[in-house]
């Protein structure tokens, strides 16, 4: 049986570390060639660059492209690199930032704008540029947008992040309606607490009392790993989800719907 993504090519933004890294590696083990689009090639958790890991552990081709998702030219360059591999089949708009936790009244315009640019605008234009390439090719495709459980429910202290991630969810539905006739599926995922640099360094959950508290009230009694996210994204990128579009999938062990 052929691997799920044999002969496919994908772009994953923010793939040097965390969820994006796990997604890129999972795609490669499923047969896809992968473009790693990130600000830097180095893994924030100290591992070897993702493209080097992929080339060392699979037969897939991998390339790193320096990419700031707030720059449309950078996004275009990442998609162009995928076209050199044979054509873009899957786009994962994963890159994002959480920013400092502050009350709503203390959030400055620059801080707000930075979060919206990275978390919402980057997804919007990443989707737009990927869709244009897929339409030109005429073979459809799959676009997966990274939201968050913070885009499903209000969360104190991270209002710009919640606003951006909620925007990703509704934008995904609208994009799916626009692009469905072209054979392009668009879905959003909503990770909960997943062990990455974002949740161990930027906005610490893992290694704190909060980890124990959240695990205790999560139906599956644990928090997540990047591989949990990667497996869902693989499904959405593959033909197994051929009739799935305009969907949001929470990857949080059941917490958001049972808390």
Predicted regions and their residues:
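Short-chain dehydrogenase/reductase
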Residues: 2-86, 99-100, 110-111, 201
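Short, small/polar-rich loop/turn modules that mediate ligand/substrate recognition or access, typified
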Residues: 87, 180, 185, 244-246
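Short C-terminal tail/terminal secondary-structure segment
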Residues: 98-101, 153, 216-220, 234, ...
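Substrate-binding pocket helix/loop in short-chain dehydrogenase/reductase
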Residues: 102-104, 111-116, 214
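Active-site helix of classical SDR
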Residues: 127, 164, 172
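Alpha-helical segment proximal to the catalytic Tyr-Lys
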Residues: 132, 136, 177-181, 242
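Residue(s) in the substrate-gating loop at a strand-loop-helix junction
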Residues: 148
């Amino acid at each position: 049986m052929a691997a799920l993504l044999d002969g496919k090519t994908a772009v994953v933004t923010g793939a040097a570390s965390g969820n994006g890294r796990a997604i890129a590696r999972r795609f490669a083990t499923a047969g896809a060639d992968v473009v790693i689009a990130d600000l830097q090639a180095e893994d924030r958790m100290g591992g070897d660059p993702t493209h080097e890991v992929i080339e060392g552990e699979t037969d897939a081709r991998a390339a790193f492209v320096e990419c700031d998702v707030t720059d449309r030219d950078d996004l275009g360059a990442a998609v162009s690199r995928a076209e050199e591999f044979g054509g873009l089949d899957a786009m994962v708009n994963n890159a994002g930032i959480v920013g400092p936790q502050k009350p709503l009244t203390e959030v400055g315009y620059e801080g707000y704008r930075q979060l919206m640019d990275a978390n919402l605008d980057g997804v919007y234009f990443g989707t737009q540029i990927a869709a244009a390439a897929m339409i030109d090719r005429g073979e459809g495709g799959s676009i997966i947008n990274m939201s968050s459980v913070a885009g499903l429910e209000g969360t104190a202290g991270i209002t710009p992040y919640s606003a951006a991630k909620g925007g990703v969810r509704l934008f995904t539905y609208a994009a799916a309606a626009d692009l469905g006739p072209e054979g392009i599926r668009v879905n959003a995922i909503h990770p909960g607490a997943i062990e990455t640099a974002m949740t161990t360094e930027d906005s610490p959950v893992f290694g704190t009392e909060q980890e124990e508290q959240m695990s205790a009230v999560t139906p599956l009694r644990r928090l997540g790993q990047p591989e949990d996210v990667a497996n869902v994204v693989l499904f959405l990128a593959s033909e197994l989800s051929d009739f799935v579009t305009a969907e949001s999938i929470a990857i949080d062990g059941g917490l958001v719907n049972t808390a």
